[in-house]
């Protein structure tokens, strides 16, 4: 199968983001994943919400804050603490990404090599 056909099938089947897929289209936005140390993001968020202990990594390797998937997004499109729908569940914007793609949602995971925290 060629890459174009795989992408069409993935879109039609509403696949969820995986480490192997790397990038998918979901409900009008592009999703990718990243694996960085989240300790500074979590520290800042804990201070902002006045709580601690909400950070955890799900069994599938997705990093979460409470019930929400941690995502990075363009702050001009999605402000910090905004909720966004992702292929892996409802996400909360706790981080920003450094691309110019306002439609990109970058999902924090423990996949591959990286921060794992």
Cite the ranges covered by each PLM segment.
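Gram-positive cell-envelope targeting signals
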Residues: 1-20
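Solvent-exposed, well-ordered loop and adjacent helix/strand elements within mature globular domains
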Residues: 18-117
